[in-house]
């Protein structure tokens, strides 16, 4: 599985997902140290439930080349409730009335996890954080920095250099001198 999707079930983790894509891409997309093979794992950062409709179909029924990591938040520190409103012809949705919005988000996440587990051959894991705090996000960042280093060792790349990025910088410097 050469594609890893992080499916974070909170818009507050949007920038974490962007950081993960940058970290994973620049650290793992390289030549192997002891061979001429190009290797790397393609990172994709998704926000649930927004990206369920655009990307879940690809994960469920597309090429089996993706693993998925879900990130859930137990306490959103937000008491927003779904209003107690009955809409004509949509009475079946009344079960959502007075439900905390955060509970709906986590139930959606749980349902997607269950659907993927039913597929039986899509690797997935789940990270649950208590709440979005500096300490918890710092721990998540530290975990991914360590994980990236370990994966680099497994696929035999130096996670701490950027030869592909450097090549573009060298060409840019040369072009700027020509101005």
Regions found by a protein language model. Name each.
Residues 1-179:
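A SIS-like phosphosugar-recognition module
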């Amino acid at each position: 599985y050469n594609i890893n999707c992080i499916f974070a079930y909170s818009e507050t983790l949007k920038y974490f997902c962007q950081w993960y894509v940058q970290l994973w891409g620049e650290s793992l997309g390289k030549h192997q140290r002891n061979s001429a093979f190009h290797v790397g794992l393609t990172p994709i950062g998704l926000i649930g439930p927004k990206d369920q409709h655009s990307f879940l179909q690809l994960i469920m029924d597309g090429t089996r080349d993706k693993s998925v990591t879900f990130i859930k938040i137990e306490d959103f520190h937000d008491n927003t409730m779904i209003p107690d409103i009955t809409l004509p012809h949509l009475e079946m949705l009344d079960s959502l009335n007075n439900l905390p919005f955060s509970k709906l988000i986590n139930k959606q996440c749980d349902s997607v996890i269950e659907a993927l587990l039913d597929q039986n051959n899509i690797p997935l894991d789940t990270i649950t954080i208590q709440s979005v705090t500096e300490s918890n996000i710092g721990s998540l960042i530290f975990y991914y920095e360590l994980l990236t280093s370990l994966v680099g060792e497994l696929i035999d790349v130096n996670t701490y250099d950027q030869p592909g990025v450097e090549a573009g910088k060298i060409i840019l410097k040369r072009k700027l001198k020509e101005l």
